Amino acid sequence: MALSREVFYFGFALFFIVVELPSGSWAGLEYSQSFPGGEIAVCETCRLGRGKCRRTCIESEKIAGWCKLNFFCCRERI
């Protein structure tokens, strides 16, 4: 009885692995957005090292752009 249960669980797990395999592409790469432009792109100020990516900017900083979802590119006020 235990052997048939093990075979069932193995087949069950194998089924979900096969279902999750992409059809002819790398997993998720067709949906990812690359860096120049897009939701996960870092703004130019932060990319050049003039700012920092944070959830909220501190009082002495201003928002210079977006780093990724829910993150601002914060730069010192002049």
UniProtKB/Swiss-Prot annotation:
Disulfide bond sites: C46-C73, C53-C67, C57-C74
GO biological process terms held by the UniProt record: defense response to Gram-negative bacterium; innate immune response
Tissue specificity statement from the Swiss-Prot or TrEMBL entry: Only expressed in epididymis (caput, corpus and cauda).
Keyword annotations: Antibiotic, Antimicrobial, Defensin, Disulfide bond, Secreted, Signal
InterPro entries assigned: Beta_defensin_dom (IPR025933)
Signal peptide range: 1-27
One Gene Ontology term, aspect cellular component: extracellular region
Record bears the keyword Signal: yes
Subcellular location: Secreted
Highest taxon in the source lineage: Eukaryota
Main subcellular localisation: secreted
Purpose: Has antibacterial activity.
Family per similarity comment: Belongs to the beta-defensin family.
Protein name, UniProt field: Beta-defensin 12
Species the sequence originates in: Mus musculus
